[in-house]
Amino acid sequence: EVQTGKGIFVKRNTISGSIYFKLVKINYLEIIEIKAFLEQKVIEKIIHSITPAQCEKLECYLRAMESAAKDDVYSAADDFKFHKIIIDASPNKTMGQMIFELRKVLDNYAMEFKDTNSTWIYTIPYHRELLNAFKEGNLKKACDAHNKIYKTDISLFSKIDSQRK
């Protein structure tokens, strides 16, 4: 929409109440902490409502990850799809968008370094624990499995940070 007056005003095509944030100074360990907090909230929201069909899709992507891991390959694409199913199951779509944006920042940063996949491959059994917890509807087990993934992420990004210094 364009309005005339003293100059031209071009209205941004946004939804009322939308927020956009740009990180000026980035602490990647803090971003992981924020992402993990939001993911934990998603787990809490969906633990009793995730459907058998969603669990079946999670199983499919997890099997692909496990199969690739046998050849010492970490399938980032299947990992993304696995987590997308979980996040998309949440009724809070804004939270999901924030998680994906934070993940993009972290993925771009990690791509600068070698051997990140050799660390993330160790999270695959924790993904299995998470899926089993979803199937059982067991919040404590789901949070414990997620926490193991989070600690692996922290360990990896701590190594990356120390390499940069």
Q: What is each residue range found by the language model?
A:
Residues 34-112, 122-129, 133, 141-155:
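Conserved amphipathic alpha-helical segments that form helical-bundle/coiled-coil interaction surfaces
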